[in-house]
Amino acid sequence: MLFPYFPLSELDVSAVRTQKENLKQFELTQFAHYEIYDLITNRTQFCDHLLRDLWLRFGLVKDNTLTLIAVGGYGREEMFPLSDLDFLILTSEQVEAQTEQKIRQFVQFLWDCGFDVGHAVRTLSECEQAGRDNITVATNLLEARYLEGNFSQFQQLDNVLQKADFWPREAFFQAKYQERVERYQRYHNTSYNLEPDIKHSPGGLRDLHLLYWIALRHTGAKNLTDILNSGFIYPQEYAQLLESQQFLFKVRFALHLILKRYDNRLLFERQIRVAELLEFVGPGNQGVEKMMKSFFQALQTISLLSDLLVKHYREHFLQTNEPVQVRLLDKEFQCVNNAICLRQANLFVEQPEQILSLFFHLTQDHQLDIHSSTLRQLHLALEQRSGYLSELPVARERFLRLFNQPGAIARALVPMHKYGVLKAYLPQWHHIEGLMQFDLFHCYTVDEHIVRTLLKLEYFLEAESVVPHPICSQIFSRLTDRTLLYIAALFHDIAKGRGGDHAELGAVDVAQFAQQHGFDQREIHTLTWLVEQHLLMSVTAQRRDIHDPEVVLHFAEAVQNNVRLDYLTCLTVADICATNETLWNSWKRTLIATLYQFTTQQFAQGMDCLLDHAEKIENHRQQALTLLTQNSLLSAVQIEEIWQHCPEEYFLRNTPKQIAWHTELLADNQTELLVKISNRFSEGGTEIFVYCQDQPNLFHKVVTTIGAKKFSIHDAQIITSHDGYVFDSFIITELDGKLVKFDRRRSLEKALMQALNTSKLPTFRATDNPKLQHFHVKTEVRFLKEQRTDQTEMELFALDQTGLLAKVSQVFSELKLNLLNAKITTIGEKAEDFFILTNSEDRALTAEQRQCLTQRLHEVLEPK
């Protein structure tokens, strides 16, 4: 043993705890110097020797009716620093009171020593019944390993477990496979979540365990070597599984060394320390990203081979009595019971372009699957191949043909990614496979994000997409050729991780791809523009004032025509949705839809002049007047009297429903201060409407109070009338993007009234997000190119720290700057905010004022 257990001279909990802690210190200091299997074996043997010693100390060795048996992971001899100590005490008869007391003391001693104990005391018949009743118990028993006591009893248990009717092979397989299906669903059917569970994520250790359990039930094999010797896997598959298992074991062992409580989730804050233990180094976060790339590639290998071998087992051992139905697909492929098989061996080696034909057949019949023998041939052919499939002219034709087939993405591109074909086709794919982005914004690796973007585009064809994505659904359904949009999505993030602007580098890549694949010049220009500008609409909608005609004109000039606008809109929405499920909400949908509508109007009007909002303002007034006439008791005179105080900008930036709501509120208001919050009138968010005489620090008071109540602010609209009254609107949501419920709205109304009724500035105690301490975002202030002399547009990039807006607004007040508008965007740990400002003379900021503002923001947001 590397670090042996020393038998106790007397029963002493502290002595065992000391040995246990010394073992952990040995593992921490020597982790890099020993093979992981040696460390796991050493810990398993440490526990074995401890239990045998205690079995003797508590006098249980004298009782010939008892047998101590390791089960579960402990039975498999997979002991990690925080693994449960699972064992069975098998008894030939009901335990007497004296023996029961000894067992209780034995177990309690282990708990006192700091072990998490999972134990059961059962007779042979009780074990059999419990195993028959529960697949988890049955699985634990199948991994039983003798430790101490009556060995013949252990053999009797083994005989019971080998009975043909004790979980017959097919029933056992179906039960364990169903567990896998349910587990995959919990993890969104992907290995590529950026905070994965080493044990339970697809491709994790549980997928290896599934192979063990199937082989164990079928042949009695207890490890990968036994499975290889049984002929169930090929030597190449064995080598790949062994390498992947070894890496996951190292990561899990390191994770357990840095934690105090059992957990297998590789959270961001843990990835840094695990990477250090595994000696992954590099500037910034490169060490973590290198480790996670290797980790995700290991998951992918295990997931792929697990899927292949599970198929192989089902086809060759469980479906042997089914009638065989063979259907010819073409000269190279045939269908055997709905599984695609090759008609000649080595087809993929001799004619590699036929690999693309395999996935074409999947799109033609959605009932088809790929036979395990075909998957094996595919896997071996890809392992042997040195060049890229895209170098073959016939393969290029067949690759492009896929995009116009029904279910092209779900039926062809997704399995091509899963089985390594995309990596074999596109030279750039290998670099992004398993490439994570160490931030709180992205949920998936780059390759998984791209595939999910493609899937989202295809989803726009489904009838159920009409409600959440009405514009995209309409656009996508009328496209006759979706190939360009799919190719743009395939390349939009393909250059990430190389350094430089990934959009510009990706545009170069897609241009080369398009030329190689025979696209014409118009198509090449469209593709390169889409990839290079794939963030344009998202940035404009979320970080610009889209009600400003100049903003709309500049956006329209960049887009140029309706075809590009349609493509860009679909790509933008799919990209946002595929980045993080929580990002897309009705508020973002409204922003994108509004920009789409304005740009369409700009194209219709022509590009030689700004979009004229006069007609829209008048339409809003008339529609609001109609609503008020129908639904309120206000007269036209009363309405007009209220509207006289509202600047034209107010009617442009608010919908008719909002205007009608505000008008009714103002008509009923008898005080100088009005604060109302509603979900009814602002699409996509909860609206706060504030009406009062302008006052110092108003914005600061509002955002500080909102922050103290733990809401997300998405938009701030500051409108001041000529007589000094503000008509301010704030769009907020709960932190998870949901609308604010009634009780929370009333509570916030009360808090805002209190804050605005006093000159005292509100404060709240900042609560740091522990995840943020591992991220470093440099504060950056950018002033957009001055288009106007009456206002300044500023972008702020900073760590999304608690009270950020309160600090920023305090700087504005300190420098006597007026805030006209704000767009608040949080992207993971990063705040990307947009402000429109004027100085105290209602002019654009001077160069000196911009410099002073930049300096103060750095001082406040990055204190030394």
UniProtKB/Swiss-Prot annotation:
Keyword entries, A-Z: Hydrolase, Magnesium, Multifunctional enzyme, Nucleotidyltransferase, Repeat, Transferase
Q: Where is the ACT domain?
A: 687-766, 793-864
InterPro entries on file: ACT-like_dom_sf, ACT_dom, HD/PDEase_dom, HD_domain, NT_sf, PII_UdlTrfase/GS_AdlTrfase, UTase/UR
The chemistry this enzyme catalyses reads: [protein-PII]-L-tyrosine + UTP = [protein-PII]-uridylyl-L-tyrosine + diphosphate; [protein-PII]-uridylyl-L-tyrosine + H2O = [protein-PII]-L-tyrosine + UMP + H(+)
Q: Which GO terms describe its molecular function?
A: [protein-PII] uridylyltransferase activity; phosphoric diester hydrolase activity
Q: Return the Gene3D superfamilies for the record.
A: Hypothetical protein af1432
Q: According to its UniProt record, which protein family does this protein belong to? A: Belongs to the GlnD family.
Listed name of the protein: Bifunctional uridylyltransferase/uridylyl-removing enzyme
Q: Which organism is it from?
A: Pasteurella multocida (strain Pm70)
